[in-house]
From Swiss-Prot:
GO biological process: urea catabolic process
Primary localisation category: cytoplasm
Family of the protein in this entry: Belongs to the SIMIBI class G3E GTPase family. UreG subfamily.
Disulphide-bridged cysteine pairs: none
Protein's name according to its UniProt entry: Urease accessory protein UreG
Function: Facilitates the functional incorporation of the urease nickel metallocenter. This process requires GTP hydrolysis, probably effectuated by UreG.
Domain of life of the source: Bacteria
Annotated keywords: Chaperone, Cytoplasm, GTP-binding, Nickel insertion, Nucleotide-binding
Organism: Mesorhizobium japonicum (strain LMG 29417 / CECT 9101 / MAFF 303099)
Gene Ontology CC: cytoplasm
Entry's localization field: Cytoplasm
Positions with a binding annotation for GTP: 14-21
Amino acid sequence: MTQANGPLRIGIGGPVGSGKTTLTEKLCKALRDEFSIAVVTNDIYTREDAMMLARLQALPEDRIVGVETGGCPHTAIREDASINLQAIAELNRKFPDLDIIFIESGGDNLAATFSPDLADLTLYVISVCQGEEIPRKGGPAITRSDFLIINKSDLAPYVNVNLDVMESDAARMRGKRPFGFTDLSRGKGLREVIDFIVEHGGLRVGTATSTAA
């Protein structure tokens, strides 16, 4: 189906290894039967994430565009988003029925935010393996993202992380902004992310999204 105001653009940020590409893959596979989807990935010097999504068959290869930012990944999603906006324009031209475009940033830190000209909603992914103190360190990515995803929760016992502490700190730092724990490799917690996207993105829902884990 086609959204009345053009495709919903969802920015996905997070440090290297947090699970951004896994999140993008899982979201594409859960939503692709219901919505027309495309992806733009950002890497500094390669198109590794785009190639990985193609190998994982998240979407047909022509719906996945990799851009090489050639420098600080923050700039390409915030101060000068032109390379991403050009990729989005090309995808819109090729697929005029698009409902959702995911924009996956390159590896970034807690100061990363998406330009409002680029993303309508922002998801930020951190990993428990980075340490239980990450939520309370704050930064715009933690405090301002529309949905904070604390991934790899299954590994908490092995990296000496207390999930209750992370939950308390995230709630304190984010106020009323939502967050959730996930184990994206197994699809745990994905349903909550999808529900947030559908509700806050104004998507029209049929039956396909009910199959997500």
